């Protein structure tokens, strides 16, 4: 199963959320627990058996069985379980900052026997500190996309404390790194700034989402990388919801 470095929700939280909000989705190869009213990822898993297949196809073609991956924004683990399968002799280091989503991530790693994944309920940036971030109450929502959750600092009494870490500091002793995969909902630049030493040392493949505001800034930040826009559309409503994605390779 996945190896978590954080305390799980207490029993009351688990009973409250799991009994009222969770459903099971079975695909051809995997089993997932998801929030029942979540939108895109759930629907894609149910219809197609995967989420963002083009991204996973790139991972399959590039990674080896002993590869190591850092995944920033693992969500419920729809990519994580596949990365675990691909890199069966390597390690996956997955970050997810949303408290409830982090619990689902760990549950899905357990259900799919992912023994090579380490999980962290921490935010990734270019600094190291503790902040209080907003907690999303999904129970009060009708339909939502929990994949849009991002770092939002609030006053202490309105949220929960979380470690903010840089990848350079977190993994200063790591011996191997083949891929950095980032889904940080507009926070990609601080994540990359905080990983510049790792990138310089290991020259990993970089798969990162971007938005139109930071596209050129990502390119400028790492001139030693060639960034290819591999944007594709979600399988559902694919004319409305573009998924903007960079593939970065060392020059």
Question: What does each of the following model-derived ranges do?
Answer:
Residues 81, 106-107, 132-133, 192-196, ...:
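Short amphipathic alpha-helical segments
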Residues 110-115, 199-202:
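Short helix-capping segments at alpha-helix termini
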Residues 28-56, 115, 120-175:
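Glycine-rich adenosyl-binding loop in Rossmann-like folds that engage adenosine-containing cofactors
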Residues 70, 93, 120, 163, ...:
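Conserved Rossmann-like nucleotide-binding pocket used by diverse enzymes
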């Amino acid at each position: 199963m996945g190896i978590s470095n954080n305390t799980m929700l207490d029993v009351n939280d688990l009973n409250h959320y799991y009994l009222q909000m969770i459903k099971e989705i079975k695909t051809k190869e995997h089993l997932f627990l998801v929030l029942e009213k979540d939108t895109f990822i759930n629907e894609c898993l149910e219809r197609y058996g995967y989420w963002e297949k083009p991204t996973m196809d790139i991972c399959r073609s590039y990674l080896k069985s002993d590869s190591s991956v850092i995944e920033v924004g693992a969500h419920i683990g729809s990519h994580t379980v596949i990365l675990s399968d691909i890199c069966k002799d390597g390690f996956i280091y997955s970050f997810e900052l949303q408290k409830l989503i982090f619990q689902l991530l760990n549950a899905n790693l357990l259900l799919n026997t992912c023994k090579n994944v380490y999980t962290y309920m921490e935010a990734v940036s270019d600094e190291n500190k503790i902040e209080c971030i907003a907690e999303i109450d999904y129970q009060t929502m009708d339909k939502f996309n929990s994949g849009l959750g991002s770092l939002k600092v609030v006053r202490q009494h309105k949220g929960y404390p979380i470690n903010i870490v840089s990848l350079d500091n977190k993994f200063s002793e790591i011996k191997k790194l083949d891929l950095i995969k980032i889904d940080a909902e507009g926070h990609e630049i601080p994540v990359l700034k905080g990983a510049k030493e790792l990138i310089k040392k290991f020259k990993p493949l970089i798969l990162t989402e971007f938005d139109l505001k930071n596209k050129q800034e990502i390119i400028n930040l790492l001139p030693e990388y060639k960034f290819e826009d591999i944007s594709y559309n979600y399988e559902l409503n694919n004319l409305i919801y573009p998924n903007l994605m960079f593939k970065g390779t060392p020059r």
